[in-house]
């Protein structure tokens, strides 16, 4: 990895470490999403505690954390594998933010933002998959898991040179959802819009 790639990777992690959910909740004088609801600083939990406006703001900011560094690397001509490393660094920053005591979110929105520079057709298909599963079953975590499982295949169809880094990124997100998988199997996972949760760290 050359100096430019290393700098881009470090910058991606630091940008990913800026917790949009925590900062937006502070700005709107809402409870800290790490301490209420599902205890997850992501758009789904902010939707529960702050409504649609706050959740959309978090979603867009989290996506930009992935888009900005990957798009920068893309235009600088960085190798696809290194672009994947940059994307993973941004998601790791979101999941384990150095600025917020390493207590972060699940990385779905940031990963979507990181995939966007590959192509709008791929991004649209990924978003359509998430929305379809979410509308049908009303589980944010299930929608995320189904989406990340099929995204490497979508990538292979549209831009096969990016399949490996995208698959690596998807594996990271599946790992971060291990508790959600357990709750889905036991029927304890809360649905989108539910206010009360019985366990921490849902979607």
UniProtKB/Swiss-Prot annotation:
<keyword id="KW-0812">Transmembrane</keyword>
<keyword id="KW-0472">Membrane</keyword>
<feature type="transmembrane region" description="Helical">
    <location>
        <begin position="68"/>
        <end position="88"/>
    </location>
</feature>
<keyword id="KW-0443">Lipid metabolism</keyword>
<dbReference type="GO" id="GO:0005886">
    <property type="term" value="C:plasma membrane"/>
</dbReference>
<comment type="subunit">
    <text>Probably interacts with PlsX.</text>
</comment>
<feature type="transmembrane region" description="Helical">
    <location>
        <begin position="4"/>
        <end position="24"/>
    </location>
</feature>
<comment type="pathway">
    <text>Lipid metabolism; phospholipid metabolism.</text>
</comment>
<keyword id="KW-0444">Lipid biosynthesis</keyword>
<feature type="transmembrane region" description="Helical">
    <location>
        <begin position="155"/>
        <end position="175"/>
    </location>
</feature>
<keyword id="KW-0808">Transferase</keyword>
<feature type="transmembrane region" description="Helical">
    <location>
        <begin position="117"/>
        <end position="137"/>
    </location>
</feature>
<dbReference type="GO" id="GO:0043772">
    <property type="term" value="F:acyl-phosphate glycerol-3-phosphate acyltransferase activity"/>
</dbReference>
<keyword id="KW-0997">Cell inner membrane</keyword>
<keyword id="KW-0594">Phospholipid biosynthesis</keyword>
<dbReference type="Pfam" id="PF02660">
    <property type="entry name" value="G3P_acyltransf"/>
</dbReference>
<keyword id="KW-1208">Phospholipid metabolism</keyword>
<comment type="function">
    <text>Catalyzes the transfer of an acyl group from acyl-phosphate (acyl-PO(4)) to glycerol-3-phosphate (G3P) to form lysophosphatidic acid (LPA). This enzyme utilizes acyl-phosphate as fatty acyl donor, but not acyl-CoA or acyl-ACP.</text>
</comment>
<dbReference type="InterPro" id="IPR003811">
    <property type="entry name" value="G3P_acylTferase_PlsY"/>
</dbReference>
<keyword id="KW-1133">Transmembrane helix</keyword>
<comment type="similarity">
    <text>Belongs to the PlsY family.</text>
</comment>
<dbReference type="GO" id="GO:0008654">
    <property type="term" value="P:phospholipid biosynthetic process"/>
</dbReference>
<keyword id="KW-1003">Cell membrane</keyword>
<protein>
    <recommendedName>
        <fullName>Glycerol-3-phosphate acyltransferase</fullName>
        <ecNumber>2.3.1.275</ecNumber>
    </recommendedName>
</protein>
């Amino acid at each position: 990895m050359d100096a430019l790639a290393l700098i881009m990777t470090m910058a991606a992690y630091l940008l990913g470490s800026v917790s949009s959910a925590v900062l937006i909740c502070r700005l709107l004088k809402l409870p800290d999403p790490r301490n209420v609801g599902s205890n997850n600083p992501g758009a789904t939990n902010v939707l529960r505690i702050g409504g649609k406006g706050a959740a959309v703001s978090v979603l867009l900011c989290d996506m930009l954390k992935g888009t900005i560094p990957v798009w920068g690397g893309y235009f600088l001509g960085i190798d696809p594998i290194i672009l994947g490393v940059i994307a993973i660094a941004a998601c790791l920053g979101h999941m384990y933010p150095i600025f917020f005591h390493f207590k972060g979110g699940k990385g779905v929105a940031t990963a979507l933002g990181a995939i966007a520079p590959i192509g709008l057709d791929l991004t649209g298909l990924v978003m359509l998959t998430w929305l379809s599963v979410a509308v049908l079953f009303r589980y944010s975590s299930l929608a995320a898991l189904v989406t990340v499982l099929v995204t490497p295949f979508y990538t292979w169809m549209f831009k096969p040179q990016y399949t490996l880094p995208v698959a690596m990124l998807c594996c990271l997100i599946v790992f971060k959802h291990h508790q959600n998988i357990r709750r889905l199997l036991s029927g304890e996972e809360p649905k989108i819009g539910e206010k009360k949760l019985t366990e921490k760290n849902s979607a």
